[in-house]
Amino acid sequence: MLEAAELECERGARTLFRAVSFVLAPGELLRVAGANGSGKTSLLRILCGLARPSAGEVRWKAEPIARLKEDYSRELVYIGHAPAVKDDLTPRENLAISCILAGQAASAEALAEALERLRVPELPVRKLSQGQRRRAALARLLVSEAPLWLLDEPFATLDAQGISLLNDLLEKQVDGGGAVVYTTHQEAGIRSTRVVDLGAGA
């Protein structure tokens, strides 16, 4: 499904990580571990195609993602560490725009149902708490049928209820044959299939 082959990432004169390799199969949940500065976010950006590795290659279904481009983008959901939601829009408007940009269509009913399930109030995002903003971003997972999820610190700012909801989503994704790569600084109850440890960092 997803293959990382001898990935290396450099920032200036510093090497964040090197020789990172794994093959992620359907139904697997992979946690990326490592201290701050070890390159966890950089690895996820490389895996989703937003950044290029200094060396190595990412493959999706045996094809280099550089060749697949938009076709690969439609097969994944990437949610970064900072919730990518616009303050002046409502959660539903943000969700609709993110689906359009990703080329992943969703009905108005599906958008409303996703936000209701995650208990996100329909207010301008600037009025939401950090945890509610995170839930608004995570609603993408409910309206997408993408087989691959790449999640950077998805549990950050969530309360106990939010963590439980996200755990349920992750379990449903892998039980349905999807795959997940995520980073986290906290034990959140979900048990990963495997761990890639990037080490101590800077």
Predicted features, each with a name:
Residues 33-35:
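The feature captures the beta-strand-to-loop junction immediately N-terminal to the Walker
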Residues 96, 106-123, 139:
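Conserved ABC ATPase "signature" region
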Residues 138, 177:
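Hydrophobic anchor residue at the start of the ABC signature
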Residues 82, 87-102:
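Q-loop/switch helix immediately C-terminal to the Walker
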Residues 53-72:
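Conserved ABC transporter NBD signature motif
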Residues 48:
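Helix-to-loop junction immediately C-terminal to a conserved catalytic motif
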Residues 149-153:
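Catalytic Walker B motif of ABC-type/P-loop ATPase nucleotide-binding domains
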